[in-house]
Regions:
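Active-site recognition of the HExxH zinc-binding catalytic motif
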Residues: 1-8
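Conserved catalytic/binding loops enriched for acidic/polar residues
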Residues: 13-231
Length: 231
C-alpha cells in the first residue's frame, strides 16, 4: 500500500477488516471449546483499499474531477468506511474510539470480553508441551508471555472509549459528521470491562502454572519480550 501512495487506515478493522493498511490482531476463536486459528488473517485486499485505488487511480469519466472524487467518498461513507491514520491511532493520548493498532471487532469492549475468554482457555491448556524436548524451561516462560498479555492491545483500544470521540477528517461542504463524544453507556461498558482486567483471577498466573517457570537458565537472559523479574 505504501508503495502506491496509501496511508494506514487504523479504523478499518471495525468494518470487517476493510483494509490491508490496518494492523489487525490475529483472529482467534473458540470452536468446540478449543482455540482455532483457522481464520487468523484475511486474504486479499479489503473494500477500503478498493476505495483508495478508485480515488487515486481511476480514469475520470466525462464529469468534473471534484464531482467524481466526492462521489467516491460519499459511496465509501454510505458503506460505513472511515479513514483515521497514524497520528490519531498511535498516540498514547489518542481519543478516537475506532482507530487502534492490533485490535479486532466492531466494538472494542465486546472484543475485549471475547479475547479474555480465549486467553483463559489458552492459559488452561498451557503446559510443558508448549516447548520442544531438550529446550530449557526458560524458553517456556517466554512462550507464555504473549499468551498472558494476549489482551493487551484490546485493552488499549477499549480504554480509548472512556472520554473518547468519534470523528472524521471532514472538509467544508462534506456530508460526514465532524465529531461526537462516546455515549455515557459506551463509556460505562468500557470502564467495567477495563476494571475486569484488574481482577485477581485475570492478573494472577494460576499456581499450577507457576511451577513451570523456574529461575532463568544460564545463557537465557531476559529480553524486552520477557516478564520483568530478578530471578
Amino acid at each position: 500500500g505504501h508503495t502506491i501512495g496509501f496511508a494506514h487506515n487504523f479504523a478499518a478493522s471495525v468494518n470487517d477488516n476493510a483494509s490491508v493498511m490496518d494492523y489487525p490482531h490475529p483472529q482467534f476463536s473458540l470452536e468446540n471449546d478449543e482455540i482455532s486459528i483457522a481464520n487468523a488473517y484475511d486474504t486479499g485486499i479489503g473494500e477500503w483499499d478498493k476505495v483508495t485505488v478508485k480515488y487515486s487511480y481511476a480514469d475520470i469519466p466525462n464529469t468534473s474531477e471534484r464531482k467524481f472524487l466526492n462521489s467516491v467518498l460519499e459511496q465509501a461513507q454510505e458503506a460505513g468506511h472511515q479513514f483515521i491514520s497514524d497520528s490519531d491511532a498511535r498516540a498514547q493520548g489518542g481519543a478516537h474510539i475506532n482507530a487502534h493498532l492490533w485490535d479486532n471487532g466492531k466494538n472494542a469492549t465486546e472484543e475485549l470480553k471475547r479475547i479474555l475468554k480465549i486467553r483463559k482457555k489458552g492459559i488452561e491448556n498451557f503446559s510443558v508441551d508448549n516447548i520442544r524436548t531438550n529446550e530449557p524451561y526458560s524458553v517456556l516462560e517466554d512462550v507464555f508471555v504473549p499468551l498472558y498479555f494476549l489482551h493487551r492491545y484490546q485493552v488499549e483500544a477499549t480504554v480509548k472509549i472512556i472520554g473518547g470521540l468519534d470523528y472524521n477528517y471532514v472538509v467544508k461542504g462534506g456530508k460526514d459528521k465532524i465529531w461526537e463524544s462516546a455515549t455515557s453507556k459506551m463509556q460505562e461498558k468500557a470502564l467495567n470491562a477495563i476494571l475486569k482486567t484488574l481482577d485477581a483471577e485475570i492478573i494472577a498466573i494460576p499456581k499450577e502454572k507457576l511451577e513451570l517457570f523456574p529461575p532463568r537458565a544460564f545463557g537465557y537472559n531476559r529480553s524486552r519480550e520477557s516478564f520483568k523479574g530478578n530471578t
